[in-house]
């Protein structure tokens, strides 16, 4: 159910683009994201900071796209989001000496501090990579190529998360005694 909910807006966006155009797809994306966040809120009684940021940026850049009839805004939204995430993680880690990943996930994953530090740096690199690649595709390719990239580009986070899981699994602290 969660996987379907996660992909719901992008699949509707892709379908609306194929059936109509980028402006219809943008409106569908905005509506689907509001619905998605409403469902998440109804199920969990809260939205994570990242979910809130995504919603605000989709509504902001989507509105600009529709009002100004300029698809560059919706195409640049992922670059802004990933860039902001990279900056937030980097400032927190190096200026504030805080590890946001550990703060968010530390209650769920018991890892040594050095592993949390490496994960944080990996996320900074990943976000910078995603911001750069989206910016490149948005700037130098057609809208159709960008829409296809958005759909098939979901392979990047899957590969990153699998690699991250493989990296952290030997470092997980197990509180249960061995039999």
Swiss-Prot record:
Principal location class: membrane
GO CC annotations on file: plasma membrane
Residue spans crossing the bilayer: 24-44, 49-69, 76-96, 121-141, 151-171
Membrane topology label: Multi-pass membrane protein
Pfam families: IspA
InterPro entries in the cross-refs: YciB
Highest taxon listed in the record's lineage: Bacteria
Entry keyword set: Cell inner membrane, Cell membrane, Membrane, Transmembrane, Transmembrane helix
Localisation per UniProt entry: Cell inner membrane
Keyword check for Transmembrane helix: yes
Similarity comment text for this entry: Belongs to the YciB family.
HAMAP family to which the protein is assigned, alphabetical: YciB (MF_00189)
Record function comment: Plays a role in cell envelope biogenesis, maintenance of cell envelope integrity and membrane homeostasis.
Protein name: Inner membrane-spanning protein YciB
Organism of this sequence: Variovorax paradoxus (strain S110)
Lineage: Bacteria, Pseudomonadati, Pseudomonadota, Betaproteobacteria, Burkholderiales
Gene (name only): yciB
């Amino acid at each position: 159910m969660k996987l379907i909910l996660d992909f719901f807006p992008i699949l509707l966006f892709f379908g609306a683009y194929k059936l109509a155009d980028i402006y219809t797809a943008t409106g569908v994306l905005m509506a689907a994201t509001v619905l998605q966040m409403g469902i998440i809120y109804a199920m969990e009684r809260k939205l994570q900071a990242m979910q809130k940021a995504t919603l605000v940026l989709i509504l902001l850049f989507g509105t600009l796209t529709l009002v100004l009839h300029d698809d560059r805004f919706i195409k640049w939204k992922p670059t802004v989001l990933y860039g902001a995430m990279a900056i937030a993680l980097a400032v927190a880690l190096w200026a504030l000496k805080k590890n946001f990943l550990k703060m968010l996930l530390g209650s769920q994953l018991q890892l040594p501090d050095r592993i949390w530090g490496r994960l944080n740096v990996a996320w900074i690199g990943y976000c910078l990579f995603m911001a750069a690649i989206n910016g490149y595709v948005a700037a130098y390719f057609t809208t159709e190529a960008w829409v296809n990239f958005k759909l098939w580009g979901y392979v990047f986070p899957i590969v990153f998360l699998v690699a991250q899981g493989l990296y952290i699994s030997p470092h997980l602290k197990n509180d249960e005694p061995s039999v």
